[in-house]
Amino acid sequence: MDTLRTFGSPSRYIQGQDASNALPEIAAEFGTRSFVLMDDIVSSAFGPAIRKAYDAHQSAAIFSRFSGECTLQEIGKQAKAAEREKIDVVVGVGGGKTIDTAKGVSLELDVPIVVVPSIASNDAPTSRLIVIYDEDHRISEVRKLPQNPDVVLVDTRVIAKAPARFLLAGIGDAIAKKFEAEQCEKTNALNFFGGRQTATALALCNSCYEIIRKHSAAALAAVEENQVNDHVEYIVEANVLLSGLGFESGGLALAHGLTRGLTAQKETRNALHGELVAWGLLVQLIAEERPAEFVSELVTFYEDIGLPTRLSKLGFNNLIDSQIQEIATVTHREAPYIKNLAIPLSVGRLIECIKEVERQ
């Protein structure tokens, strides 16, 4: 398998304003009983509309409350509840942790899954990966569905009602994919399907980057007013679909690897995944020895749209050398993706790269 070029994707991707109205009809393709998982915030904001849609379609839906953290205990609890109800399809409505918990239930019960993201802050919706946390909110393991979600249904009207910070975080997550995939190509790194990259994966990563550079500012301005326009549609597709396909079939490198070191620090508890990745990309570009002008131009773009350029923006208000040391050490020890960097990276060199970003 590791010599074969491999590409994976959801069976179907649907996006547009009021797309969630079609949820009962789509779920009914897999059976008559849906297990709909939502947290309290999403249930309060969008639950009534989803319930109304199911009632209008005269479909059975069992609604279950997500506790807020994707742990083995939460997956087990939800799977038991779904099994008791003899459900046919799992529907995950919400953010990344809700979606990953729904994927976990789908895996436990071997039933189809429909993913309905309420925010476009990361590329979890299209992925078959399930990121599981421990009770201390640290990543404990990553599991995989046998295939990507059956359907990803993205309602851009719902996305636009969320705070613009979530869309911006999705941009931060997505913008790194082009550069990480390029490093994986150089090192012949395997993607998340255990195969080599396809030209399609690299093309999607490039397209993702181009869309982000062209449409981000206008999309963020629209979402600040809870409006949907073509710029928003482009950015949502980049954040969710292109970024998701790009990372799984293209691979990851240092930008994502640094999240291991960052999330080990209590200062980043309130930072979003994409914010961490965006900063991590700057470190990766320094490690790649990219021209200073290139990095400086990207920093300017970050500043223009609001992405973090320094650790102070991620919660490190009084940064000290020992914190940089720990970020670098944990990343080097625990992040598997750093080996995908074309230039070998020691802990000492990683510390130097972080400090150079902080001097930008």
Residue ranges with predicted function:
Residues 12, 34-35, 61, 88-91, ...:
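Structural motif
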Residues 107-200:
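A glycine/threonine-rich phosphate-anchoring loop and its flanking beta-alpha core
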Residues 1-89, 311:
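ATP/NTP phosphate-donor binding region
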Residues 20, 43-46, 72, 97-104, ...:
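Short glycine/serine/threonine-rich phosphate/pyrophosphate-binding segments
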Residues 192-307:
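Active-site segments that bind and position negatively charged phosphate/pyrophosphate groups
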Residues 82-105, 109-119:
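A short, small-residue-rich loop immediately preceding and capping a beta-strand
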Residues 22, 290-360:
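C-terminal charged capping/lid subdomain of soluble metabolic enzymes
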